[in-house]
């Protein structure tokens, strides 16, 4: 440092008190009620408006109005300002009339003036607080206790409890009496309103307005309703996903004025679109394409039975309908019209099936000479029951498919999935979508099918089930030996399974238990054809031919007859049972038709018996001498001799076999 420079040293405060006073000037006391802001209203846009809470001054003023000052001060205390000098009043008036008062300037009192100001304000706040506490203490709002004062809780006495209960009972009784009076008055007014006697027009308008909003609330539980300006409209569309309130599917809602002759009507009046003001039905049936039914495949152009169209003369009748019926019928018409249009579009796209569309009738080839027929029928828009035509089962299935299609969400939301737990190497585990090529992915992909394609499968299965049921009924009615019974194991839309049970009552006498000789075979029905499956797992494909199904059932019965003959020949009741030389259920006759047979030999080896069971015919029985040595035998001595099956003793196959075996046992 140079000699000419001045050294400025920092000035330290003389004491810490002076520093503290410069930083903190007085004490701030905030006295106000701890109230939350109350909600005044909530707007339609969701904005909440609050009430500004009361300040401490407002709260003190409200409490001060409740204080009886005469009791605190005394009635004889004089009013301090009662004696006022009239000259002072004149001075105040002159000041008020003369003009504005000059602003008073607080004189400076040194560095402690601001501190004195804040202390004075704090003192005023404390004085106000003491006044509030004294008021609340003297009026039993709050009693101050010291630390040493014991806290005692006064328990209510029995007299107090009984008094309180009695008071509560009295108030409850009064409340119930008032409620009874209100209900009685409402009942009287309701009775008067029903008879419409002595009621004012305003009251009737109030009743109609109340009923209108009640029915409108009931309508909103089922239908989509909204208000646009001064109009109330609804939506008839049936789509769950997609566009709502489309113009062709909107109905208007209005209020009608009811009179005495319209008591049963609804106060809500709806106006549906004119193209939907008719009742509809979509009939599905299976018809045969032949000469007899050729004229009934399409409608007669001159027949106006199912071709109803809206007329202006029916507008008054439509208005008198209840809104529940009108909206339900109109939506059903919209649904069936769209479905029939979609089915016709899908039928045109099918390349392997011929289809014809004419006069709201769709014919599409099913199989062989059978056609699937869709007919859209229209009826007047009025109350009454409509007779359901077509196949009821197919109508219900089509309705269920439509509802299922509308309830299906085709766009699946994205979600995380865990990797499968495998024992493959890491390189194979992490292949992801690269595990299959494009051809394999497309082969395994589940493709959506249209309603028409699924209906064709269901209708084909329906026709085949009906055909198999008729065949089973004929088999069980014709065949008495053995007895054939059938029952359904499972029934589905596209696959079903029927079980045939063959029994013979004479087996109980020879075998003892019928369960051991019971034989079954099955009929598997799909949309493509029918196949008969034996108990051994042999399947016979019958396609869609009822004659082949009948033939397969009779063949299974012939196999059962072979089993029955073999079982009876080995029966332990025989002293010398017969021996089975040969049994072939796959044997053929000279014409190449299936003919299961069995060859028996008695114990003495003197006679051979041949049973041949032709399908759909009586069995043939042949007998000849047993061949001991084929080299030395003479053909004329060992020829098969045919026995007349109808002349054998016994009414059933079991009895005839029993009689024949008894006769040839020792010969």
UniProtKB/Swiss-Prot annotation:
UniProt GO cellular component terms: core mediator complex; mediator complex
Subcellular location(s) of the protein: Nucleus
The keyword Signal belongs to this UniProt entry's keyword annotation: no
Coiled coil: 172-197
InterPro entries, sorted: Mediator_Med17
Predominant location category: nucleus
One GO-annotated biological process of the protein: regulation of transcription by RNA polymerase II
Entry's Gene Ontology molecular function annotations: transcription coregulator activity
Keyword Transcription: yes
Keywords: Activator, Coiled coil, Developmental protein, Nucleus, Transcription, Transcription regulation
Quaternary structure, from the entry: Component of the Mediator complex.
Function per UniProt: Component of the Mediator complex, a coactivator involved in regulated gene transcription of nearly all RNA polymerase II-dependent genes. Mediator functions as a bridge to convey information from gene-specific regulatory proteins to the basal RNA polymerase II transcription machinery. Mediator is recruited to promoters by direct interactions with regulatory proteins and serves as a scaffold for the assembly of a functional preinitiation complex with RNA polymerase II and the general transcription factors.
Protein name (record): Mediator of RNA polymerase II transcription subunit 17
The encoding gene: mdt-17
């Amino acid at each position: 440092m140079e000699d000419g420079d001045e050294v400025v040293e920092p000035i330290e405060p003389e004491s810490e008190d002076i520093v503290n006073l410069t930083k903190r000037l007085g004490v701030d006391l905030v006295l106000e009620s701890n109230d939350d802001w109350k909600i005044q209203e909530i707007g339609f846009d969701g904005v909440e408006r609050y009430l500004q809470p009361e300040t401490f001054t407002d709260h003190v003023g409200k409490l001060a109005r409740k204080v009886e000052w005469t009791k605190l001060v005394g009635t004889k205390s004089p009013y301090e300002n009662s004696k006022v000098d009239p000259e002072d009043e004149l001075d105040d008036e002159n000041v008020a009339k003369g003009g504005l008062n000059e602003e008073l300037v607080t004189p400076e009192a040194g560095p402690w003036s601001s501190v004195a100001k804040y202390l004075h304000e704090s003192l005023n706040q404390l004085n106000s607080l003491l006044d509030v506490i004294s008021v609340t203490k003297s009026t039993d709002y709050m009693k101050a206790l010291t630390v040493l004062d014991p806290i005692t809780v006064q328990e209510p006495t029995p007299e107090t409890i009984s008094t309180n209960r009695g008071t509560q009972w009295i108030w409850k009784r009064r409340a119930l009496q008032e409620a009874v009076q209100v209900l009685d008055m409402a009942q009287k007014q309701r009775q008067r309103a029903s008879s419409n006697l002595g009621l004012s027009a305003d009251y009737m308008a109030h009743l109609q307005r109340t009923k209108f909003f009640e029915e409108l609330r009931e309508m909103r539980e089922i239908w989509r309703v909204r208000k646009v300006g001064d109009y109330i409209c609804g939506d008839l569309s049936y789509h769950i996903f997609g566009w709502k309130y489309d113009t062709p599917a909107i109905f208007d809602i209005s209020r009608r004025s009811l009179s005495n002759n319209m008591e049963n009507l609804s106060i809500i009046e709806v106006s549906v679109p004119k193209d939907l003001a008719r009742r509809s039905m979509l009939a599905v049936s299976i018809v045969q394409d032949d000469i007899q039914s050729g004229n009934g495949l399409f409608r007669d152009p001159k027949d106006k039975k199912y071709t109803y169209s809206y007329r202006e003369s029916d507008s008054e009748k439509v208005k008198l309908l209840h809104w529940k019926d009108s909206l339900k019928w109109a939506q059903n018409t919209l649904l069936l019209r769209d479905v029939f249009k979609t089915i016709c579009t899908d039928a045109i796209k099918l390349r392997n099936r011929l289809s014809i569309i004419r006069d709201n009738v769709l014919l599409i080839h099913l199989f062989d000479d059978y056609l699937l027929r869709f007919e859209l029928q229209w009826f007047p828009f009025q109350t009454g029951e409509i007779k359901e035509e077509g196949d009821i089962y197919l109508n219900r299935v089509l309705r269920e498919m439509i509802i299922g299609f509308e309830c299906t969400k085709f766009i699946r939301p994205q979600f995380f999935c865990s990797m499968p737990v495998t024992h493959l190497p890491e390189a194979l585990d992490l292949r992801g979508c690269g595990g299959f090529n494009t051809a394999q992915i497309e082969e395994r992909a589940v493709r959506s099918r249209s309603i028409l394609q699924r209906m064709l499968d269901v209708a084909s299965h329906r026709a085949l089930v009906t055909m198999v049921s008729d065949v089973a009924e004929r088999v069980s009615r014709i065949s008495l030996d053995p007895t054939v019974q059938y029952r359904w194991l499972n029934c589905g839309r596209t696959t079903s399974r029927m079980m045939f049970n063959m029994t013979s009552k004479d087996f109980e006498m020879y075998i003892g238990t019928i369960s051991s000789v019971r034989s079954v075979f099955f009929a598997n029905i799909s949309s493509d054809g029918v196949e008969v499956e034996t108990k051994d797992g042999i399947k016979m494909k019958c396609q869609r031919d009822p004659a082949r199904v009948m033939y397969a059932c009779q063949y299974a019965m012939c196999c059962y007859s072979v089993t029955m003959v073999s079982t009876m020949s080995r029966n332990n009741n025989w002293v010398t049972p017969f021996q089975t030389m040969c049994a072939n259920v796959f044997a053929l006759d000279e014409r190449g038709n299936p003919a299961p047979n069995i060859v028996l030999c008695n114990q003495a080896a003197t006679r051979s018996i041949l049973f041949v069971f032709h399908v759909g015919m009586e069995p043939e029985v042949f007998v000849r001498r047993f061949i001991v040595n084929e080299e030395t035998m003479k053909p004329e001595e060992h020829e098969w001799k045919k026995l007349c099956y109808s002349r054998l003793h016994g009414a059933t196959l079991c009895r005839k076999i029993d009689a024949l075996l008894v006769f040839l046992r020792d010969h």
